[in-house]
Amino acid sequence: MGIRAIVVDTAGTTTDLNFIKDTLFTYSAKALPDFLKENETNVLVDNCICDVRDIALEPDASLERVVEILQQWVEEDRKATPLKTLQGLIWKQGYARGEFTGHIFPDFIDTIESIKQQNIRIYSFSSGSAEAQKLLFSHSDGGDLTPHFDGHFDTRTGNKLFKQAYCNIINTISLAPKQVLFISDVIEELKAAEEAGMRTLQMVRSADQRTGNFKQIASFKELTF
């Protein structure tokens, strides 16, 4: 059964992890106080603030306290949906102002079009919001890559470390599990995808990266179908 769709992880696979941590995370942490003050009456932002209070079990937390909680979550790389939603909104602002572009590994930029020419669908799956993924790929070093994508999945689909998230993706794209290839640098994610029946490849971009018993590639140019 041939591959009909590829699901790619972002950080460490299509995107340098250092760009995520040093540029995007740092930018969002610094921008949070002013962004929340200026946008707290926005319905989406207000919902996120309420969700932060609920998750932190601090229903009466002030806006300043919510900022503290969010900045702590950024430090911990917490996979909390309200944080990821707010980060996406803040990054949208940063991209629009031209304060940074989205780093994408050149081998992915060079390969994505040839993958599509083989009638293979491409999806991304990240703990970052779908909106943040679209921003990353639309403002990339290689220009707007979003026309090559068929969809983006985030934490609303499920936790990347658990089988159910990948089952949900399979159901959404309406393919047999073995027709879907998941590519990630993270062993635990690959295990979960494998449990769901997907084919897997581990992206290994550095010599000191933790590896497992998965087929490995160091570049998207190594893909063969």
Curated annotation (Swiss-Prot):
Entry keyword annotation includes Nucleotide-binding: no
EC number: 3.1.3.77
GO biological process: L-methionine salvage from methylthioadenosine
Entry-linked Pfam families: Hydrolase (PF00702)
GO molecular function list: 2,3-diketo-5-methylthiopentyl-1-phosphate enolase activity; 2-hydroxy-3-keto-5-methylthiopentenyl-1-phosphate phosphatase activity; acireductone synthase activity; magnesium ion binding
Cofactor(s) recorded in Swiss-Prot or TrEMBL: Mg(2+)
Domain of life of the native organism: Bacteria
Cofactor note: Binds 1 Mg(2+) ion per subunit.
Gene3D superfamilies per the UniProt record, alphabetical: 1.10.720.60, HAD superfamily/HAD-like
Catalytic activity: 5-methylsulfanyl-2,3-dioxopentyl phosphate + H2O = 1,2-dihydroxy-5-(methylsulfanyl)pent-1-en-3-one + phosphate
Keyword Amino-acid biosynthesis annotated: yes
EC class of the enzyme, as a word: hydrolase
Pathway given in the UniProt record: Amino-acid biosynthesis; L-methionine biosynthesis via salvage pathway; L-methionine from S-methyl-5-thio-alpha-D-ribose 1-phosphate: step 3/6; Amino-acid biosynthesis; L-methionine biosynthesis via salvage pathway; L-methionine from S-methyl-5-thio-alpha-D-ribose 1-phosphate: step 4/6
Keywords from the named record: Amino-acid biosynthesis, Hydrolase, Magnesium, Metal-binding, Methionine biosynthesis
Function: Bifunctional enzyme that catalyzes the enolization of 2,3-diketo-5-methylthiopentyl-1-phosphate (DK-MTP-1-P) into the intermediate 2-hydroxy-3-keto-5-methylthiopentenyl-1-phosphate (HK-MTPenyl-1-P), which is then dephosphorylated to form the acireductone 1,2-dihydroxy-3-keto-5-methylthiopentene (DHK-MTPene).
Family the entry assigns: Belongs to the HAD-like hydrolase superfamily. MasA/MtnC family.
NCBIfam families for the chain: enolase-ppase, HAD-SF-IA-v1
UniProt-listed PANTHER family: ENOLASE-PHOSPHATASE E1
Summary of subunit composition and partner proteins: Monomer.
Name of protein: Enolase-phosphatase E1
Organism, scientific name: Shewanella woodyi (strain ATCC 51908 / MS32)
